[in-house]
Amino acid sequence: MNDRITLAQAHCQPREKKEHKLGQARLAELLTQVPGWELSNNGHALTRTFQFDNYYRTLAFVNALAFIAHCEDHHPDMNVHYGRAVVCFSTHKIGGISEIDFICAAKTSALYEQGI
């Protein structure tokens, strides 16, 4: 990825080969660019919980995120609750985390910061 483009500005490219799975050093580097996200599932996923005032705002966020996921062709696992949504990205075909998970995490954080 071009260093002049932020993760939130980048677009997903298919990552289906095992060599696209990120190593520990690159994971640690990219984690600094997505505050609030953490490794989960024994380091095989990237997860963040988003808080909302009510169920309507939670679902509005989830629906907006669904549109972003569709456009990027990379879809998170989500748990939706009253006042919160747990979003989890991983690249299933490689059995871990790739750069596209960080791109989508950054886009998700940007959506949340917009107050959707």
From Swiss-Prot:
Disulfide bonds: none annotated. GO terms for molecular function: 4-alpha-hydroxytetrahydrobiopterin dehydratase activity. Gene3D superfamilies: Transcriptional coactivator/pterin dehydratase. Pfam families: Pterin_4a. GO terms for biological process: tetrahydrobiopterin biosynthetic process. CDD domains: PCD_DCoH_subfamily_a. Keywords: Lyase. InterPro entries: PCD_sf, Pterin_deHydtase. Its EC number is 4.2.1.96. It catalyses: (4aS,6R)-4a-hydroxy-L-erythro-5,6,7,8-tetrahydrobiopterin = (6R)-L-erythro-6,7-dihydrobiopterin + H2O. PANTHER family: PTERIN-4-ALPHA-CARBINOLAMINE DEHYDRATASE. NCBIfam families: PRK00823.1-4. Belongs to the pterin-4-alpha-carbinolamine dehydratase family. This is Putative pterin-4-alpha-carbinolamine dehydratase.
